[in-house]
Amino acid sequence: MTFSVQETLFSLLRLNGISGHENSIANVMQHAFEQQAKDVWRDRLGNVVARYGSDKPDALRLMIFAHMDEVGFMVRKIEPSGFLRFERVGGPAQITMPGSIVTLAGRSGDIMGCIGIKAYHFAKGDERTQPPALDKLWIDIGAKDKADAERMGIQVGTPVTLYNPPHCLGNDLVCSKALDDRLGCTALLGVAEALASTPLDIAVFLVASVQEEFNIRGIIPVLRRVRPDLAIGIDITPSCDTPDLQDYSDVRVNHGVGITCLNYHGRGTLAGLITPPRLLRMLETTAHENNIPVQREVAPGVITETGYIQVELDGIPCASLSIPCRYTHSPAEVASLRDLADCIRLLTALANMSPEQFPIEPETGATQEARP
């Protein structure tokens, strides 16, 4: 079977799954893994795991992971008028909320709605230029009152996702909601396809994880079961090629997958990843040998599961591959199919390496700067 990056990505983007409600994506991931993998399971939290490669008990264990959930909302209250108050799940960009189309997972099926906005003709002062506070926003599903909304299948706790089906833009770019992190899920399926008939010297565990956007720790039960020697995460990173971010960094779409040197989130979570230099060298050398374009990134304000995985068990060496993405956590994220394909190529090359090529143990001499 020929793997199509675009078709696979678009099929995943058409699914909805905020944190804690990833089943539709998990079902697709599990079914795809079961076509080739030696062993596939879904744990009690909903993480989907597939094992490829060596069955030897002492084989080096490489875990590659990406999260299935997307940012969104949850219904908090149904007003007597039938309008819905809601809370954020994860960090959807609040500035984009008013006027957005949303999908609600009703008891009997999906329901369309929109986030209301004060009529521009009657808006005054800051109301015309500043987004309202979250507690001033509401969702309109066309219900005439609370009882009508309940008859339509809405209740407190109903999941809500942003609505924007995938579209193709120019130069291999795509626009959609939930590119964070269906890009990573697509990469997992691309690697799975590549490894299906390939003998490996190591054991590779592909993990589609849950609740990254909510608590960043949904994957923890998996790593305690798998006990990997090395973990590599796949996620998005802000692309800084737009007019508002050009002075921030050189990370750009269509210039290869990002290799994270540092990410850090200090607003409450206080965690992040400083990638060990030996792993940076491994990633850059492998990319160079396979003619795969990569770009380094330092990303304060960004955090992934690696921030917590690295301090589990006896300490797990971690690295992160980041696919540049414009307009993150908005209904219209933009990323490159070319960068996604490069990510799949790099991960596949890593999975095909011999155990001796993985620098698991820390260096004992002076730290050397990573270089290809």
From Swiss-Prot:
Disulphide bonds in the chain? none
InterPro entries found in the cross-reference section: Peptidase_M42 (IPR008007), Peptidase_M42_aminopept (IPR051464), Peptidase_M42_dom2 (IPR023367)
Pfam family for this entry, one: Peptidase_M42
GO annotation, biological process:
proteolysis
Q: Which cofactor does it need?
A: a divalent metal cation
Q: Which Gene3D superfamilies match?
A: Peptidase M42, domain 2 (2.40.30.40), Zn peptidases (3.40.630.10)
Q: What is its EC number?
A: 3.4.11.-
Binding of a divalent metal cation 2, residues? 180, 213, 329
Q: Which residues bind a divalent metal cation 1?
A: 67, 180, 235
How is the cofactor bound, in the record's words?
Binds 2 divalent metal cations per subunit.
- Write out the entry's keywords from A to Z: Aminopeptidase, Hydrolase, Metal-binding, Metalloprotease, Protease
What are the catalytic residues?
212
- Extract the GO molecular function terms from the UniProt entry: metal ion binding; metalloaminopeptidase activity
**Recorded family membership:** Belongs to the peptidase M42 family.
Name it. Answer: Putative aminopeptidase SgcX
